[in-house]
Amino acid sequence: MYRYLVAAVAAVALAALQLPTAALAQQPLIIKFSHVVSPDAPKGKAALFFKEVAEKYTNGKVKVEVYPNSSLYKDKEELEALQLGSVQLLAPSISKFGPLGVKEFDVFDLPFLMVDDARAHQMMASPMMADLNKRLEAKGVSPLAYWDNGAHVYTANKALLWPEDFRGLKMRIQGSKVLDAVARELGAIPQIMAFSELYQALQTGVVDGEDNVPSNILTQKFYEVQKHLTVSYHGRLTYALVTNKKFWDTLPADLREPLGRAVKETTDFFNATAEKDNADALERIKASGKIQFHNLDDAQKKAWVAKLMPVHKEMQSRFGKNFLDQIYKASGFIPPQS
């Protein structure tokens, strides 16, 4: 009897020891997705869409936690957090990759390079991106997709109709050498600043203006603290959906395949959402009556292009003429002849 009792106790103890392991195996994989914009912006909507489809396609084996509005990391902190493995998904603008040490991504900030949807999509689908992706992966960051968030417009506390209107203005930029050169060529004073700090900086006059896509200007309410908006379409905002390379490479196949499918569907969702939301945002901002709208006429547009083309020449020393020529060919951009 005693022998049977000991055996039973041992069996119960062994089962108890095995319970945490079994329970652990049932726990979903947590993926933290951090971003700096509103949940109502195209990127915010896409993050929530990804959460929905990723959890669905993995049958609950993955749980996606979305952190909007810089609630987990500010934009100048998040890439380092990704490299350290503290967060698994980000969608920063590709302007952030220059300071990371992949300067070639700054090329996409060249003025008037990708001003329309077709040209932008053509560029991001070109074979050139494979080489740039490898350079990013060497930093421990794996691009999963590129999201086109549309063309930039300017806001400021004075009307920006001609290049000389920028002279002396403090303009917020991202940390891109090209954007710095653009501001200086216009006679403005570039101010690198985190996205989360921009509203207050505009409100208090720390900076005089900024450029962004209409959906961000609407959802962050920049139009409430600026007097003028110029529909300039001088540049483009492209996001990269990126993950930690080691994290992605070590995912089991039964998770990587459905997550890859979720990425593709989310990319299609994002691009369609951004196009619609930016058009709607312009109308809503205009209807608010809180900011004065300006559309550039042909003469003004030509003056902007002529003023900013020297930035392309200046950046040949940074990127090399051959690389720039490849970018022009891939994007369909034809530099004006001087």
Annotated model-derived regions:
Residues 14-23:
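C-terminal segment of classical bacterial N-terminal signal peptides
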Residues 7, 25-119, 127-338:
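N-terminal secretory/targeting leader peptides
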Residues 122:
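Short beta-strand-centered segments that line the small-molecule binding cleft or hinge
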Residues 1-4:
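Positively charged n-region of N-terminal signal peptides that target proteins for export
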Residues 6, 10-15:
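Hydrophobic helical h-region of N-terminal Sec-dependent signal peptides
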